[in-house]
Regions:
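Gly/Thr-rich phosphate-binding beta-strand-loop-beta motif of the actin/hexokinase/Hsp70
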Residues: 1-29, 103, 110-131, 147, ...
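Short glycine-rich phosphate-binding loop at a beta-alpha junction
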Residues: 53-62, 198-209
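Phosphate-binding/catalytic loop of phosphoryl-transfer enzymes
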Residues: 76, 81-150, 181-190, 226
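Glycine-rich phosphate-binding loop signature in dinucleotide/nucleotide-binding domains
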Residues: 106-108, 194-199
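Active-site rim beta-loop-alpha module in soluble metabolic enzymes
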Residues: 137-197
Length: 246
């Protein structure tokens, strides 16, 4: 469906992520609530919580789910070319683009967004709302799960509430140490490199693992972690910027 050139009062934002559906309920420009659901295999029925058949503004990184939701009666798919963000490249993930757009709207530019989801991504924009670039690597849980799935003897391990010993003396903690400490070192390096170019920039942490990752950062590198801001809704705030322009 083509973008509707009318102002929306009540509308739903839907971000289709790699692991889940992320929803937001807007009344005008106000984000009333946000929630997550599992991916669906069919169009939702009357039991699914879409209030009053509202318009859905959708962004997606999962093509199969995009195709499913395009059959909904009132849906608009948000694409890169609709974003007021300069310097984007064709394969940039719409989630990353919306996140850095939303972070800039709320927290100011320049800004670096770290999204701790299935993938761990870094995305930065300068003061002119131009994409500087970023990086992608497997997220914390994906790294842990990959070791369990692709090796014969290593167990599936969960993220600990607190940092494991760096030099572990058992296999579960050794896996936690290897994954977590190398990710933290990488995050520190990226943030420090960003601050060299943009010393006044905010660092925004979002995504499903944002809280536990921030706690690790604040423990291991408090001089970094204590300056990181968490915001779970910046993708939806980026959507709001796009929808407001319709």
């Amino acid at each position: 469906m083509e973008p509707q050139r009318r102002k929306q009062n009540n509308w739903l934002g839907l971000m289709i992520g790699n692991s889940r559906l992320h929803w937001a309920q807007f009344v005008g420009k106000t984000l009333e609530k946000a929630w997550d659901t599992d991916h669906l295999s069919t169009i939702p029925n009357s039991q699914f919580p879409i209030p009053n058949s509202q318009s859905i503004y959708l962004a997606s990184v999962v093509p199969e789910q995009t195709a499913l939701w395009q059959a909904y009666t009132d849906v608009c798919v948000i694409t890169l070319d609709q974003l007021p963000l300069e310097g984007v490249y064709p394969t940039l993930g719409i989630d990353r683009a919306l996140a850095v757009l939303g972070a800039g709207e709320v927290w100011g530019l320049p800004v670096l967004v770290i999204d701790a989801g299935t993938a761990l991504t870094f995305t930065g924009a300068d003061a002119n709302r131009r994409l500087v670039g970023g990086a992608i690597l497997p997220g914390l849980r994906l790294q842990l799960n990959s070791l369990a799935q692709k090796t014969a003897a290593l167990p599936k391990i969960e993220l600990p509430d607190k940092l494991a010993p760096r030099f572990a003396r058992n296999t579960p903690q050794a896996i936690q140490s290897g994954v977590i400490y190398t990710v933290l070192a990488g995050i520190k390096d990226f943030i420090q490199a960003w601050w060299q170019d943009f010393p006044e920039s905010k660092i925004i942490l979002t995504g499903g693992d944002r809280a536990i990752l921030l706690s690790y950062l604040q423990t291991q590198f408090p001089e970094i972690g204590n300056h990181v801001i968490t915001d779970p809704n910046i993708i939806f705030l980026g959507m709001r910027s796009v929808v407001s322009s319709y």
